[in-house]
Amino acid sequence: MVVQNVQDLDVLPKHSSDSFDDDGRPKRTGTVWTASAHIITAVIGSGVLSLAWAVAQIGWIGGPVAMLLFSFVTFYTSTLLCSCYRSGDSVTGKRNYTYMDAIHSNLGGIKVKVCGVVQYVNLFGTAIGYTIASAISLVAIQRTSCQQMNGPNDPCHVNGNVYMIAFGIVQIIFSQIPDFDQLWWLSIVAAVMSFAYSAIGLGLGVSKVVENKEIKGSLTGVTVGTVTLSGTVTSSQKIWRTFQSLGNIAFAYSYSMILIEIQDTVKSPPAEVNTMRKATFVSVAVTTVFYMLCGCVGYAAFGDNAPGNLLAHGGFRNPYWLLDIANLAIVIHLVGAYQVYCQPLFAFVEKEASRRFPESEFVTKEIKIQLFPGKPFNLNLFRLVWRTFFVMTTTLISMLMPFFNDVVGLLGAIGFWPLTVYFPVEMYIAQKNVPRWGTKWVCLQVLSVTCLFVSVAAAAGSVIGIVSDLKVYKPFQSEF
């Protein structure tokens, strides 16, 4: 008699229908490709722009090895996390709609609150990082126009505050989209844009290497005493920059905190866990190839002077029109990525508000507005006020602290170990009843502890960088 594991059966869960899923919610429509688009939109973001700088800090050996290791860890722990979307049976078990729901079902207790704080602080910080990155790209577009008129030697300093405000206004509008599932089209557009500017950066890097007639860089990266764009590198700076570069690479692979929310958009059959494993493999494989190419080619082109933002910090100067297209693509991508990251935070706050104030019309009432022919738009006053306040806050903080590389490194360090490694590992151990002190348990714990040390080191390097920047920075005078 052949016994087949129920996890391998692509069956439709009970109590589902043509219009609704087994949990009574509207039928989910996500596929491998839409899930991959969501992930790629989240992963290939502004982090790719700092990879050449990160590789420059640790060299031709450390750079590629670090990217490969981070990609492996991210893929492996993401497959563990995929298994936690449903509690119990992976096909018919109770759904966990958010990352925190999965923590609550599998771990419970104080870990739920700790996870919530880390996850939502990281999402909040990512919104700040994306606002800064968008302003840098818009400033770069204005700078190329200025240098076309005044010559390439004109520094053309531009205040980025107006662009941060403009980006914030756009986000206020898009943030009124009620649900994550309705963002599929924005994610696809953003994913296409991410490929576009990554490809342009890669092409410009290759052309720069050909122009130089040499491959720059060294096996161990920037050496003590080297004069870079930001000054002479001291021994302590070498250490802190090495740690910060690990944070930048970790941030480039950061998406675990929204993986469960993405999985909740996927239809079944086939089982959601199978779809997400495929989507995770496709996404991580594609992004790793892009990261290796962009980071290594950028380092080969500029060596120790690789800029913090490959397309906007003066690394390339020609052709102007292509640089403008690349930076515009970055901005369009960041509009979508901002929403992909913030929707889980929006949903959490609105769910809590509805639970605490179920009788309040301000919180719960949906006002139907017919903007265009067809389906009316649902306007919720609490959603309007809260999401607008959130965007305004992230914009204000971005104007106060526009340190792209340091912020990116700190975000990567804060989020990588707890969200990408620790909680997925602990949930998997709890759900699968992995025996304590068994071989698998020990291997998982070694992985977790190793990543903890990496995160602490990366956070320290980024904090030192922010402190150094604050010594010379004047608030609301963000010139790039």
Curated annotation (Swiss-Prot):
What Gene Ontology terms describe what this protein does at the molecular function level? amino acid transmembrane transporter activity; basic amino acid transmembrane transporter activity; symporter activity
Pfam family name, one? Aa_trans
Q: Which InterPro entries match?
A: AA_transpt_TM (IPR013057)
Q: What happens when the gene is disrupted?
A: No visible phenotype, but decreased uptake of L-arginine and L-lysine.
Coiled-coil intervals, chain numbering = none
Q: Where is this region: Disordered?
A: 1-25
Chain ranges sitting on the Cytoplasmic side read 1-31, 74-120, 179-182, 263-280, 350-383, 428-445
Cellular component, GO, one term = plasma membrane
Regulation of activity is described as:
Inhibited by 2,4-dinitrophenol.
Name the Gene Ontology biological process terms: basic amino acid transport
UniProt keyword terms in alphabetical order? Amino-acid transport, Cell membrane, Membrane, Symport, Transmembrane, Transmembrane helix, Transport
What residue intervals traverse the membrane?
Answer: 32-52, 53-73, 121-141, 158-178, 183-203, 242-262, 281-301, 329-349, 384-404, 407-427, 446-466
State the tissue distribution: Expressed in leaves, stems, roots, siliques and flowers.
Superkingdom of the organism of origin? Eukaryota
Miscellaneous remark of the record: Basic amino acids are transported in their fully ionized form.
Q: Which family does it belong to?
A: Belongs to the amino acid/polyamine transporter 2 family. Amino acid/auxin permease (AAAP) (TC 2.A.18.2) subfamily.
- Spell out the PANTHER family in the cross-references: OS05G0424000 PROTEIN-RELATED
What name does the UniProt record give this protein?
Answer: Amino acid permease 5
Please name the source species.
Arabidopsis thaliana
